[in-house]
Amino acid sequence: MESQGGGTILLTRGDIALKLGLPVAGVVGFVHSYADGAHTSIPAPGLGALAAGMGGKDSKLVHDLAKLGVTPDDIAVVSKHDTSTNANDPNESELHNTLAHAIGRTDGNPLFVISQKSLTGHAKGGACIFQVNGLTQLFKSGVVPANAALDCVDPKLKRDDHMVWLREPLKVGSVKAGLATSLGFGHVSGFAAIVNPGAFEASVANTAGEDALNEWRDRANARLAAGQRRLEEGMMGRAALYEPIDNRRFHEDGRGYDAHEVEKAMLLDPNARLASTGYFEA
């Protein structure tokens, strides 16, 4: 039976997270998609995402991470798509190892591999969402998970001197950043660098002050606690785990409100916001 998993990531600007008291699980240090080559097989993985390192030590990836205080040596892990196919595993490993050398990672500095599917199974459409979520969990725990299914490693991967596959969990402590990639599937590759949420806190402290940072922490922790309570109440049947939104936040009032026209206007207006009624108004 065919099935798909999925997931949702709430992505906001830092000032919005501060204003709303949103918990921050990670900071997007760099994100890009790439064509990975013309292949006879639609899901065949290529090396297109290696272009993330275009320019080497002078690449946009290196410069963007530097703005957050992260160097190539600070990237502790890579969460790989790892489909255990003859094509994907060697290609993805070669890509990250080549990239590490290109952007100036110190020889001998290990780059630990997280094979997310060995932990959660293959979500297919939601696979990289699982990978990014796994990186945010690493920021919290400081523990790199092992690949319990690692019975043998493709001999081709021996060439990749930075890459390390763990057979047991490894506590590494504070992690500054990690990479996540998804290769192939429509000749498109996705590449993201996720940075520890400490980068957000440092930015708030520098731009808004310690008082603003402490206020944000209090509000964010309250949101986390409320979310955990709601989850547990839902698991015990005391609250709904899902409540549908009425008509996608558009409504028909039988008079001058045309949901179709209001939706078009909302999509074209950069200042469009939900009204206090919970709907987009005309």
For every predicted segment, state its role.
Residues 138-186, 190-191, 200, 206:
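Internal helix-turn-beta structural module
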Residues 1, 31-48, 80-90, 107-161:
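Acyl-CoA/ACP chain-elongation machinery
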Residues 1-70, 76-77, 195-262:
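Condensing-enzyme catalytic core mediating Claisen C-C bond formation in acyl metabolism
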Residues 15-17, 33, 83-85, 118-120, ...:
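Short, glycine-/Ser/Thr-/acidic-enriched flexible segments
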Residues 263-282:
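Extended non-globular C-terminal regions
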Residues 7-13, 61, 96, 129-139, ...:
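Buried hydrophobic packing segments
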Residues 48-77, 82-87, 92-110:
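A glycine- and small/hydrophobic-rich beta-loop-beta segment
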Residues 1-3, 20, 70-71, 105, ...:
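Solvent-exposed alpha-helices and their adjacent loops that cap or buttress functional pockets
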